Every structure is written in structure tokens, then in C-alpha cells.
Amino acid sequence: MADDATTARDYRETVFLPDTPFPMRAGLPKKEPEILEGWAALSEKGLYGAVRQKRQAAGAPLFVFHDGPPYANGAIHIGHALNKILKDFVVRSRFALGYDVDYVPGWDCHGLPIEWKIEEQFRAKGRRKDEVPAEEFRRECRAYAGGWIEAQKTEFQRLGVLGDWWNRYATMDFTSEAKIVEEFHKFLATGQLYRGSKPVMWSPVERTALADAEIEYHDHVSPTIWVKFPVVQGSDAAVGAKLVIWTTTPWTIPANRAVSYNPDIPYSVFEVTALEEGLEFEPWAKPGDRLIIADKLAEDVFKAAKVASWKTVEAVDCEGMVLAHPLADLDSHYGYAVPMLAGDHVTDDAGTGFVHTAPGHGADDYQVWLAHGHREIPDTVDPDGAYYPHVALFAGLKVLETEGKKVGKFGPANGAVMEKLIEAGNLLARGRVEHSYPHSWRSKAPVIFRNTPQWFIRMDHAVDSLDGKTLREVAVQAIADTAFYPDGGRNRIGAMVETRPDWLISRQRNWGTPLAMFVDKHTGHPLNDPEVNARILAAIREGGADAWFTRPDADFLGAHDPAQYEKITDILDVWFDSGCTHAFTIEGRADSAWPADLYLEGSDQHRGWFQSSLLEGCGTRGRAPYKAVVTHGFTMDENGEKMSKSRGNTIEPQTITKESGAEILRLWTAMVDYQEDQRIGKTILATTTDAYRKLRNTMRYLLGALAGFDEEERVTDYDQFPALEKYILHRLWELDGQVREAYQSYRFSDVIRPLIEFCQGDLSALYFDVRRDSLYCDRPDALKRRAYRTALDYVFDRLTIWLAPLASFTMEEAWTTRFPEAGPVAYRVMPERVDAWRNDAEAARWAKVEKVTSVVTGALEVERREKRIGSALEAAPVVHFADEDLLAAFEGLDAGEVFRTSSATLVAGDAGAFRVDEVKGVSVDPNKAEGKKCARSWRILPEVGTDPRYPELSLRDADAVAYWDAGRG
């Protein structure tokens, strides 16, 4: 008879081993384009169109998601990627929740950045902008924007972003421009539009007015001066003294027309008695000088002026006081009287307690000037940021440089004004101060307040079509009626709207939508003739905004005399453009609806698109064009620093997609708290990639473990499920509620993070590990194995649909690997939550079981470290329970299976050698397993060899092999 060693059977063929074509290595950069190609082939509008068709056929409720338009200029950056991926999460999750989602991507096309680019292109060809016909210039702008729309669209689609790309909108489309003008005409018709000469934020570099939304603040170092105004009328103590003002804009002194004071602030005449000694320069203050300053600020002023001591002469009342301009002695141009004006904007927190008032260069200055009955606003600075020729002493000097290497820097005006003040004997002191200063958000150059005629929309004008309410009142109520995510957004935009000035909507540029209207040359009133407006709109629909600039006025005016009217050639604020997108994208379309269910953009859009859309909607329709607003933060580098090419800390989405795949970028977006600023970099992406691998491995295991699963194998009676399966089903029930609620509230990290934890904890560390032996070695018809595979089927089913909106490429790959004929995973709707799966008792039980398991695992680790055992299957621990509640948790369980050992014994008492401080009432004796090693399952049991048919196997394995042999025979 042959030796047993030569005849021992190889049982590997009788063991089930997970098998799947789903690869461990994702190869995302190669795989994703293949998936995109498959999606594109599903319908004329790709996967997006195919899903909409299915939802509409099923009568699904409509969800309208309106896209905030990115600017059509340049390749997308990481901020664009974050924004569009978040939007894709919304689209796909709403599809998964059973909605028919309307999402039309769009682009903002007008404005200065493109205009600058085209100017550069013409300069490179030796042509100045003023030498290029406006029609040709605008045509080049349109072509430039169109090219970037196509480029960005391709990049967004590569990220897996779904939408109606085939009907994308653009603010430069002829129909869009016509609709924008139509919306503008509504403000004209309701009396909300007016022309005003007032100081506005002006960018000399860009040569145009800017709205609040186009301003950003940066730290800036400015000169600061204390200036003396001689008192020519007032009390005896005041006349002959000099009143002191403080300003950080010396260049505005030639525009001074008044000084403001606050009647509630005490002021006095102070006399200089001594100067500081040992100075390297001679102070401009002199002993005997009498100066008028707010009492609270006198010490600060004298310190700046290097005055060592002073005395109070007497208190003064500023009402009725008249001053001379500090430059009056140098030129008669400044020989006018300078009145004192009471104003509550004046404080004694800093400065001198007085405010130098130049009504053409400040909002408060302008308001207080008008409030006191003055109407004439002086023009001091021209559109290029230089003094007009009529400004004595300073004609032609630049306030701000607009050309050459110093573009965006303050020019010689400040220095020249200070020198003349010294010459006049009216500069008391000067210094420098770092403060927050307004800059253009496009050019990044400082801006100035400048008086100029502009067109405005009134915020506080009662409008009949708004039930007699003002635009501000309607907008404030609309904010209260809107849902904000996070909720703090309501207060942020609310504070802005409550205090904002009238909406400045005119710009003095070429590339944009025109304020297409005529103004009566005699009355200054805009022409509001419906027939004229209809002709204007028809022309723009046919030929775009160019028609307004190229066609004769008579084409529009009809019976009106062209000689009587001025055609307005200003263009609209680009924020007005984008604020109208709801009117030509969602309103009036058969497969959409107004208002939108959702707007989603960066938090800076509280003062941008959210606000312009709000004001446009409220001004024309009496409500916001959205029901809810979601905001996200900004992308920073790994150290929390702002990204910039000069710092070399940028990371491009194209690079991530090429090297790692768009899925990694999508997963990073899902995992961050997007409502705050997010950090991204190589180290962070490496962590994201690691999380992705674990997620992919979970899906791969599920696919392999479910190989061959069919409905005959399914366990349909919940009561037949073992305790562990009931716990896993409970976790699915629990996660179902969390996932739905998180998606409904746009909290995507609250979807991905619990699911990753579920995969790594409940599944990989517990469920897969505990049931591995059953999956591999139980006979196929064994109830426990069938229950396991049934539960895995439910897990796979839920994970794929829950994760599909986020990890879209991988869930598509996993789903179609298992069900190649079922269509894309995006076709699916989340199955209803199965309340029968809720089992709080099993959840409580397995929390206790896991505590006990941690003690057993700790004991076995010691045994491995001491090399007394190799694997856990070599152990048969005895677990002692002083805590009866913990012992009761194991009722009906196979403790050896739970501990991943060959067997285990549970006893009441407290005699075990190994303990863990964190788990009271449990101790373990990590005994070695006794018996023989099963040649199939490798468990060491006394029963191995007791079945004569299979002497190398345990009884369970012998039965399984017999079943297998019978099936093969």
C-alpha cells in the first residue's frame, strides 16, 4: 500500500475562492475615458440625457439646478474642479434619489479680462484698440470666449460631470444678450433705473466703474497726513486758529469742499507750548500754534506732530464755522469758503475727530454734501486717474499709474500735494499706515472713488409692481425665505443687502451687453417706449449686441426723431449679465421650471452671483430665482496658504487626472468639508488615494465573493439570518437613513466618510474576516453561507448606488462588471429603506462582542510576539467573563469563528491571565488548539479524522467535500 503522503488529496478545488475580473489596480487614467465613451453613446445627450429620459418616463419629480457660470477665459483650475465636481454630486445624487434633474452648464463671457486679452492680441499686431472697429473687436472677443468654452467643457466632462452640455448657455449668445436687455428694460419700465452723478469705485487701470461685487480688499501702505485748515469765521478763540484733519488720500485735498464734524464730539482749541527736543528735522508745528482737535484725540495728534506740551485754550462749537482751503494762499482756484458740515459718520475713534470732505471722492462725503443742500459735485480726476487740466497746481499729475512698469502703483499726485501743503504752511505731520484698501478683483490694482455720471438701479424706491415695496425690502424678505447651506450664509448676504448702495450697472467698456436705450437730450429722461424696445430686442436676437452699436438709431426709434435722443453706449455690469441667467436658462423651458431649486457657488458669490441674481429676480419678479443656496470655500495648499503660480504651490486638476485619475479628485472633493476652505497637495492626495484603494478592495472582494450568486441561493426569510447578518443588515438600514439625509442636505462628506468607515470597520475588519471560513469552506447550500452571500448582495447593491454619485467611475465599473447587461448604475434609484432590517438589539450585542474580541486579539498578539503561535487558527482561547452581560452577548454565536480561532471556550468567572484595562470583566487564557489540522480549512480540532471517508478533514469540511464530490459525480 502506498504511503499516505503520496496519496493525500489536494482539496483546493473544493474550496470556493473569490474570483472577479474587477482588477485590484484601477488604472483610472486609462479606464475613465473608456467609461466616458460608453456614457456618451447612451443617447444624443449621453448618460445625462439617458437618465432624464428614464426619470421622465417614470413621472419623477423635477429638480432644477441652475449653474453659476464660470468665466470663459483660460484652462480650468483646482477651484473650478471643486465647484463642478460638487455640482455633479448634486446632479447624480438627485438622480439617485429619484428626481428628474435639469442642469444646464453655462459660461460668463463678457467683461474686462477677455477685452484685455484681445487688446494684447491687437497690440502684438501693431494695432491700438482705438484703431480697431468696435464690431471687429467684439467679434474677436466672441471668438476668444467661444474657444475657451469648448476647452473648459472638455475638461469638465473629463471629470465625469453630467449636464446638458449639448444645450449649454453663454451670456454672449444672441438670445442671451436679448434676454438680458429685456430684463434691463423691465427696470427701466418700473422706474427703478436712474442716472446719477456720484462718486463710484473707479479703476483707472481698467478705465471703468466697478460695483461692490467687483471689489476685493488687500493690505496696502498709504501716506497719511494731518492738514491744517485756517478758520476764517467762528468764535473769537477759533478765528485765527487752524482746524486739523487727517487723511490717507492726500491726492483728494484739491477736491476738498468741506470739513465734517459730529455735534456730539467735544472739540477744543489747543495751543502748542513746546516741541520735542533732539529731533533730526524741524517739525512743522510751532510754539504758539493754535489748533482745533477733538479732545479725545489731541494727544495722538500732538504725538504725531512731535509736540511735547500744549494747553487747552477753550472748547469750541463747530456749527457755523467757516474755513479756508489749505492751498488758498498758493492759487486763487482754492479761494472758496470751506463750510463745516454736521454728520453722524464722524467719530473720535481715530484721526482728529474731523473728516476732510471731498464729495466727488467718497460715499459719506457725497451724502453729507447733499444732505446740507449742496448739489454741485466737482470733477477733479479724469478716467485715466490724472487731474483734469482745470485743477490748479496739479493739472495732469497721475493719481494712479495706468501704463508702463508702474501700472497699478500710486503716481506723483500724493507727493505733489504734500509738497504744496508744506509750501503753504498747512501740513502739520505725515506718516505711513498699513490698512485694508479696495482693489479691482480683475486687475488687482487699487481703485479710487471718482465722481462720474453712471446708471443705477434704486434700492429704496417704492415700486408698484412690487406691491409698493422697495427692492431692498423685497430682497431682504427673499433672503429670509431661502434655505442656506451653511445657514450662516443667510446672515452674510443679508447684512450686505441691508446696507448696500444703489446698484451701479453701467460700465464704460466695449465687450458686453449694452444698456440698450435712448435718453431725451433735453429732459435727460430715458425713453420707455414698448415699440422701440421691441425693435431693439428683435435686432439683438437676430444679430447679437453688435446690432445696437452698428445699426442706425432710426432703425429702433421709429416715429421718434433721432436728433432728439442720445443712444447710450455703456455696457451692463457683468454681474447684471450673470444675474439674468435664470431668465434665459430655466424660465420658460418645457423641461425646466422657475425658480430653481438650487444655486451652488463659492462663498464669495454672496456679494457676486447670488446677490445679483437675487436683486434681478426680486426687481423683476418679486422673489429670488432660487429656493436654496449652497456655498463652498476656497482651495488652499497643504499648509493652508493661498495658491499662486509665483509661489509654486498650485496643483492642476489636469495633472491629477492624467497621473491618478479624476476619481481621486472626486473622492478628495467628497471627503473634505467643502463649506470651509480646503487644503490639497501631493501628501493629501496620497491619503485620498489610500482611502480609494481600500474602497476599491472592498468592491473587489464583494464582486469575488458574490461570483455565481443567484436568486435560488438568496435567503428571503429575515428570521433565518444568523445574528451577524442581522447586524450587517441593521447597519445598512442605519446607513440608508444617514446617506439619504446627507445627500438631501448636500453634506457629501457625511456620505463618504461613514461608508468608508463601514467598509474598513464593519466589513473588512469584522464581517469579511469572520465569515471568510464559511464562504470558502461551507457547502454551497449551507444556510450560514447562503445568508452571508445574500447579505453581501445587499451590501453591494447599496454601496454601488450610495457611492455612485461620488465615486462615479469606480461604481460604474463595479456595477457593470457584475451586471453587464443592466445598464449604467446611474439608471438606478435608491431602493426604499427596509425598516424590517432595523435591529437595535443586534447592534447592542455586536458592540459588546467587539469589545470582548479586542481582548482576545490582544492576548493572541502576545502569543504571536512570543512565537508560541503563528496564526490565530493555532489557538483555542478560554475566555473568562466576570461580566454576565458580555457573556450573554455570545449566546447562539460560534465564538471560535468570531475570534477567528480554531475554537474557543467561554466560561463564567475571572480566572484568565490576559486582561485589557479598557474592557472590564473579561480575561483570556490564550491556549493552543488541540487536535489535528484540517487539510482543507486549516482549523485545528479534535474531530479531524473522525470521518473515515476524509481522514484529513473536520466533520464540517468532510460534509462539504462529500457534497462537492456528489455534485461532480
Swiss-Prot record:
GO MF annotations in UniProt: aminoacyl-tRNA deacylase activity; ATP binding; isoleucine-tRNA ligase activity; tRNA binding
Record carries keyword Protein biosynthesis: yes
EC number: 6.1.1.5
GO CC annotations on file: cytosol
Catalytic activity: tRNA(Ile) + L-isoleucine + ATP = L-isoleucyl-tRNA(Ile) + AMP + diphosphate
Binding-site positions, L-isoleucyl-5'-AMP: 601
Pfam families xrefs: Anticodon_1 (PF08264), tRNA-synt_1 (PF00133)
Disulphide bridges, residue numbers: none
Gene3D superfamilies in the cross-refs: 1.10.730.20, HUPs, Ile-tRNA synthetase CP2 domain-like, Valyl/Leucyl/Isoleucyl-tRNA synthetase, editing domain
Swiss-Prot/TrEMBL keywords: Aminoacyl-tRNA synthetase, ATP-binding, Cytoplasm, Ligase, Nucleotide-binding, Protein biosynthesis
InterPro entries: aa-tRNA-synth_I_CS (IPR001412), aa-tRNA-synth_Ia (IPR002300), Anticodon_Ile_BEm (IPR033708), Ile-tRNA-ligase (IPR002301), Ile-tRNA-ligase_type1 (IPR023585), Ile-tRNA_ligase (IPR050081), M/V/L/I-tRNA-synth_anticd-bd (IPR013155), Rossmann-like_a/b/a_fold (IPR014729)
Residues annotated to bind ATP: 645
Compartments where located: Cytoplasm
Segments carrying motif 'KMSKS' region: 642-646
Domain of life: Bacteria
Motif placement: 'HIGH' region: 70-80
Main location: cytoplasm
Example GO BP: isoleucyl-tRNA aminoacylation
Subunit structure: Monomer.
Domain remark text: IleRS has two distinct active sites: one for aminoacylation and one for editing. The misactivated valine is translocated from the active site to the editing site, which sterically excludes the correctly activated isoleucine. The single editing site contains two valyl binding pockets, one specific for each substrate (Val-AMP or Val-tRNA(Ile)).
Function: Catalyzes the attachment of isoleucine to tRNA(Ile). As IleRS can inadvertently accommodate and process structurally similar amino acids such as valine, to avoid such errors it has two additional distinct tRNA(Ile)-dependent editing activities. One activity is designated as 'pretransfer' editing and involves the hydrolysis of activated Val-AMP. The other activity is designated 'posttransfer' editing and involves deacylation of mischarged Val-tRNA(Ile).
Homology family: Belongs to the class-I aminoacyl-tRNA synthetase family. IleS type 1 subfamily.
Designated name of the protein: Isoleucine--tRNA ligase
Natural source organism: Caulobacter vibrioides (strain ATCC 19089 / CIP 103742 / CB 15) (Caulobacter crescentus)
